[in-house]
Each structure stands twice: as structure tokens, then as C-alpha cells.
């Protein structure tokens, strides 16, 4: 679980970089939405990993 949380966190960072760095307007909007989605998925997986108690990298 923690492995997936880290993967989604990295994806959200990449999407955030493209969304907030000033690329074109359409791409920035899509990247900001993806950033929010993957950040939420990261937090959900992180909470599930902590609650499971057997989170291994």
C-alpha cells in the first residue's frame, strides 16, 4: 500500500509541476486537476497503509 501511495505522490508532483509552472492554459488546467486527484489518492493510500500496519516499502 505504501508503495502505491509513494507512486501516486510522485505522479501528483509531476502533474503539479506542469500545472503550476506556466505551460499553456489548457494543459495547466488539466495538470492541476490531475495534481488534485493524485494527491487525494496518495492521501487515501497513505492512510490505508498506516491503518493496515504492515506497510513495507
Curated annotation (Swiss-Prot):
Pfam family, one: DUF1328
Annotated TM spans: 4-24, 33-53
Subcellular location as annotated: Cell membrane
Keyword Cell membrane: yes
Keyword tags: Cell membrane, Membrane, Transmembrane, Transmembrane helix
Signal peptide: none
Database matches in InterPro entries: DUF1328
Topology with respect to the bilayer: Multi-pass membrane protein
GO cellular component, one term: plasma membrane
Family affiliation: Belongs to the UPF0391 family.
The name this protein goes by in its record: UPF0391 membrane protein Arad_3976
Annotated source species: Rhizobium rhizogenes (strain K84 / ATCC BAA-868) (Agrobacterium radiobacter)
Top-level taxonomy: Bacteria, Pseudomonadati, Pseudomonadota, Alphaproteobacteria, Hyphomicrobiales
